[in-house]
Amino acid sequence: MTSAAITPPTTVDRPMTDPFGRTIDYLRVSITDRCDFRCVYCMAEDMTFLPRADLLTLEELDRLCSAFIAKGVRKLRLTGGEPLVRRNMMSLVRSLSRHLKTGALDELTLTTNGSQLARFAAELADCGVRRVNVSLDTLDPDEFRRITRWGDLDRVLAGINAARAAGLAVKINSVVLKGSNEDEIPSLMRWAHGLGMGLTLIEVMPLGEIGEGRIDQYVPLSLIRARLSANYTLTDLPDSTGGPARYVRVEETGGRLGFITPLTHNFCESCNRVRITCTGTIHTCLGHEDASDLRRPLRASADDALLSAAIDQAIGSKPKGHDFIIDRRHNRPSVSRHMSVTGG
């Protein structure tokens, strides 16, 4: 894959703004729906993935990302599925890194389960990636196997060590699960902070059928925070990324702890992001079914005029907030698509 064939981004006249005055400068792109784990809160064990022919090519993903950068996106995150299982994905990372060199892009980053990180960490750093988010819900090998079904904890920990050795900043993302890892949060926090890594806790989200009810997995993070406050001093931080996390400093560890609470605390008022699936569908809200097709305008012309207009139309339809709810009366997915398709 070469960047020479890709149309370079033009100068940004003005940033993209949605109907509620929010600047859209963060793009999350799922480059594959495939994953080498089958986490119990994410997908069913017998998950059927998209035919490979349905996915955008790496060149198309590059052109799509570049079109958003030309329209004011400053932060780009590659997700999945597990992005590092897509063949030749590093050629996409290397090509997109040209936008870092020109200053058109502030940050190129990745969310991963860590299983392939030992193999790719050094190359990611060489491409200008400065930090990665690693999804890790437990440090107990048996519980890790139960949650991921197919995962190997030692391999993930080796990936985290390789990332740190390569100079990548690592943040741990943990989904809190009732009766599973909820009592392990303090030790997970001490471990992460002890290695200089941030930890962000995430409530279960009602996305896609998983073969069981999410109400049996759901723990409100307000409860977890109250438990932590009994033994730790949590000081609210003003840090804002335009995203869903609210941060505290844990005085006893010196580390930062984030809470993503779509169900107990709506996080939509400052949303600055949109998501693109590996098939070229744009979702302007994680918690809505509404979507727009960007693959057709992408393939309809060699220049980006049609694509740019389609992006503008999609941003113009971004809703004010999500519709997530979990309770006994609403124990079905609020959104039918899985996070592995949308991009986690």
UniProtKB/Swiss-Prot annotation:
Residue ranges occupied by any Radical SAM core domain in the UniProt entry:
19-239
Q: Which SUPFAM superfamilies match?
A: Radical SAM enzymes
The record's annotation in Pfam families points to:
Fer4_12, Mob_synth_C, Radical_SAM
Quick one: a GO biological-process term for this protein? Mo-molybdopterin cofactor biosynthetic process
Where along the chain is S-adenosyl-L-methionine bound?
41, 81, 135, 205
Keyword annotations: 4Fe-4S, GTP-binding, Iron, Iron-sulfur, Lyase, Metal-binding, Molybdenum cofactor biosynthesis, Nucleotide-binding, S-adenosyl-L-methionine
The UniProt record gives the binding positions of GTP as 28, 77, 111, 171, 273-275
- Record's subunit section: Monomer and homodimer.
**Name of the molecule in the record:** GTP 3',8-cyclase
* Native species: Rhodopseudomonas palustris (strain TIE-1)
**Gene transcribed to yield this protein:** moaA
